[in-house]
A protein has these predicted regions:
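Short Gly/Thr/Asp-enriched flexible loops that form oxyanion-binding sites at enzyme active sites
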Residues: 1-10
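Catalytic core of soluble alpha/beta enzymes
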Residues: 3-4, 56, 81
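Generic detector of short, locally flexible boundary/turn motifs and exposed helical patches
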Residues: 7-8, 30-32, 44-45, 68-70, ...
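ATP-dependent carboxylate activation and anion-phosphoryl transfer catalytic cores
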Residues: 11-15, 37, 60-63, 72-73, ...
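A conserved helix-loop-beta module that forms one wall/lid of the active-site cleft
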Residues: 14-77
């Protein structure tokens, strides 16, 4: 969380810039970007007061998932129940990517074995997926590449999605390494951390981007 202050004081930040991290964490700005890319998201809103949150929840319909910005692993997230609709029976999945700011590589898509909205500490995933169709796998990879390239991510990125009624929705983007990187690296035989390190230090080393085709 100190990256922005360091940058303001002249410290060069390697990899993804603090402004891109802000873009991913600010729910309103991120939704604007998804609208621009024509990538669907569940209905949502951003509130700074209880009254605003109640108004947004009333428009969306219950149950709603409430979570703060700038947190890791679903910390502070709550599901508020009532009677209406949300992504009631959605399958959650995620994808890790390596990007050099212009091109992105998505080695795999992981399928969660619990429904969308479970805290990451209580979640588990499988790779390769069992229940995600080939069409949706390609859609997830395409969305991940588009978002990484639009945000000019440099290094690792994690995307979380939900699939309901055979439609893929973006839940959030995390322009950083995630807990699933070791799993993807091992299963796909892709050295993701060394590749990301080469990318974020390429300006210093002068070596070309190692993003795989």
């Amino acid at each position: 969380n100190i990256a922005a202050e360091l940058e303001k004081n002249g410290v060069k930040i390697l990899g993804t810039s603090p402004s891109v991290i802000d873009l991913a964490e600010d729910r309103d700005l991120f939704r604007e970007m998804m609208d621009k890319l024509e990538i669907p998201m569940p209905e949502s809103g951003m509130a700074t007061t209880v009254e605003e949150a109640l108004e947004i929840a009333g428009k969306i319909g219950y149950p709603v998932m409430v979570r703060p910005s700038y947190v890791l692993g679903g910390r502070g997230m709550e599901v508020v129940y009532d009677d209406d609709r949300f992504l009631n029976h959605a399958m959650e999945c995620e994808a890790d990517a390596i990007s050099d700011g212009t091109h992105a590589f998505v080695p795999a898509v992981m399928e969660h074995i619990e429904l969308a909205g479970v805290h990451s500490g209580d979640s588990a995933c499988i790779l390769p997926s069992v229940h995600i169709s080939e069409e949706n796998l390609e859609t997830i990879k395409e969305y991940t590449r588009k978002i990484a390239e639009e945000m000019h991510v440099k290094g690792l990125m994690n995307m979380q999605y939900a699939i309901e009624d055979d439609k893929v929705y973006v839940l959030e983007a995390n322009p950083r390494a995630s807990r699933t990187v070791p799993l993807v690296s091992k299963v796909c035989n892709v050295r993701m951390v060394p590749l990301a390190t080469q990318i974020i230090t390429s300006e210093l080393t002068g070596k070309p981007s190692p993003v795989p085709e």
